């Protein structure tokens, strides 16, 4: 074979080969841009094609290979769960809102368009985070934590707005609102993982000062959430914090002590009447649903009626009678699962639960296969978050958990929740891609 032909076959050393033009550092990177020695086959590229049009073929070639490599190393089973839930959620939101909007003389597709935009923006955020080396999140975590903490402070100022009795929102120009507590879930997980893994790449267990630092890190957002107050987010954050500490390798006696302190704090909160009256009423309504069926217990009672009326296969999408009459309060957000139960029936509800199970199984798999302790803790924290939030949301719809106002991940309407959920999926994909590329 002539030297001229060899230069265009992509073999190492050829002056015209793409591989030969890479720097020694680039050549040494495993899977750089998806390009390997011998990766360009004879006949696949012609010298004339590389020079035509005044383009930079090497950059285009590397960009195409990098894009192909990025897609190949995604966890597509995880993406199936996310896309399936997002699609079903968008349809259910449309069904839950179109009748009320039509009766009011508005556009029946208003919430459909908004949620589609939320999903698209969320997917863009997910792709951006997925493309990062997740170890760089060690650098970004403190910045994100500071920003979300400031946001939690702002909601308590005059810039914050009250929704359903809680100062959880920031009013933005154009009629938009942001809920910092949703993003605080992500940054809390990253910061706690950073603290508990910073010195854990060896075999040493976390020291008492590591545990104290993690608890102090959680205390700030937890205190600000209590001040709003948002009981659902508070329960979720405490569970995620305790779960991540438990998985960090902490000694059992410290874990038992932490559990005792958590239980004592809950008891003191209840005994000193630190909860708002409406929060106490929600808890008592859960314990005795028949105590106030037309007041505090109304939402949960109507949700159970809607689910029961769906039967095995449901009344059909867009044909739910209770949904059309808007008998279930907050049916496009907190009680979206009731819409699924009435219109899609038991089968549709099981499909949603199955997609959530796929998401959780893949998240745990990513955690187990993570390259380091930081990746394990981050993925585990996200798995705990999604599992508990889905359980609480579905549970309050069927009457086995109190009504707390937590949305169903990827299904309930909301921009802040969707963006935070998608960012979390991006972090999971980044952890997975790191393992997949170098496995």
Question: What annotation goes with each model-predicted range?
Answer:
Residues 68-72, 206, 210-211, 325-328, ...:
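Helix-boundary and loop/linker segments of multi-pass membrane transporters
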Residues 230-235, 315-320, 331-333, 350, ...:
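Transmembrane helix boundary and interhelical junction motifs in multipass membrane proteins
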Residues 55-56, 71, 78-79:
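N-terminal anchoring/assembly modules that precede and organize ATP-driven motor systems
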Residues 174-184, 228-229, 311-315, 403-420:
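Glycine/serine-rich anion-binding loops at beta->alpha junctions
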Residues 59-73, 106:
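Cytosolic juxtamembrane amphipathic/interface segments immediately preceding
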Residues 2-37, 41, 46-47, 51-65, ...:
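A juxtamembrane structural motif centered on a specific transmembrane helix
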Residues 78-95, 101-299, 338-398, 423-427:
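Hydrophobic alpha-helical transmembrane segments of multi-pass inner membrane proteins, especially
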């Amino acid at each position: 074979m002539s030297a001229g032909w060899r230069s265009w076959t992509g073999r190492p050393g050829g002056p015209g080969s793409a591989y030969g033009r890479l720097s020694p550092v680039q050549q040494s990177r495993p899977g750089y841009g998806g390009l390997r020695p011998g990766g360009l086959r004879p006949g696949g590229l012609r010298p004339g094609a590389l020079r035509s049009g005044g383009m930079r073929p090497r950059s285009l070639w590397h960009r195409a290979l990098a894009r192909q490599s990025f897609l190949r190393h995604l966890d597509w089973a995880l993406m199936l769960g996310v896309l399936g839930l997002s699609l079903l959620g968008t349809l259910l939101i449309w069904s839950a809102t179109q009748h009320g909007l039509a009766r009011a003389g508005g556009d029946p597709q208003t919430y459909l368009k908004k949620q589609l935009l939320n999903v698209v923006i969320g997917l863009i955020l997910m792709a951006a985070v997925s493309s990062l080396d997740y170890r760089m999140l060690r650098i970004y975590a403190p910045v994100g934590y500071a920003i979300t903490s400031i946001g939690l402070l702002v909601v308590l100022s005059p810039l914050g707005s009250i929704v359903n009795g809680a100062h959880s929102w920031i009013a933005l120009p154009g009629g938009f609102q942001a809920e910092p507590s949703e993003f605080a879930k992500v940054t809390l997980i990253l910061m706690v993982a950073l603290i508990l893994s910073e010195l854990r790449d060896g075999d040493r267990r976390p020291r008492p000062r590591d545990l104290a630092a993690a608890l102090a890190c959680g205390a700030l957002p937890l205190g600000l959430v209590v001040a709003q107050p948002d009981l659902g987010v508070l329960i979720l954050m405490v569970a995620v914090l305790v779960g991540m500490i438990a998985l960090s390798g902490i000694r059992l006696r410290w874990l038992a002590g932490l559990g005792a302190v958590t239980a004592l704090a809950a008891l003191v909160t209840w005994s000193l009447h630190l909860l708002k009256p409406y929060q106490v009423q929600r808890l008592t309504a859960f314990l005795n649903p028949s105590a106030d069926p037309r007041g505090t217990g109304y939402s949960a009672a109507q949700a159970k009626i809607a689910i029961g009326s769906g039967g095995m296969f449901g009344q059909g999408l867009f044909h739910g009678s209770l949904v059309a009459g808007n008998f279930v309060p907050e049916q496009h957000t907190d009680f979206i699962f009731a819409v699924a139960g009435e219109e899609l029936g038991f089968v549709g509800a099981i499909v949603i639960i199955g997609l959530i199970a796929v998401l959780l199984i893949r998240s745990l798999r990513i955690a187990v296969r993570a390259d380091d302790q930081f990746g394990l803790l981050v993925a585990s924290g996200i798995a705990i978050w999604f599992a508990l939030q889905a359980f609480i949301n579905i549970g309050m719809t069927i009457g086995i958990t109190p009504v707390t106002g937590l949305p169903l991940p990827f299904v309930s309407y909301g921009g802040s929740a969707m963006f935070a959920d998608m960012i979390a999926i991006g972090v999971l994909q980044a952890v997975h891609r790191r393992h997949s590329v170098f496995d």
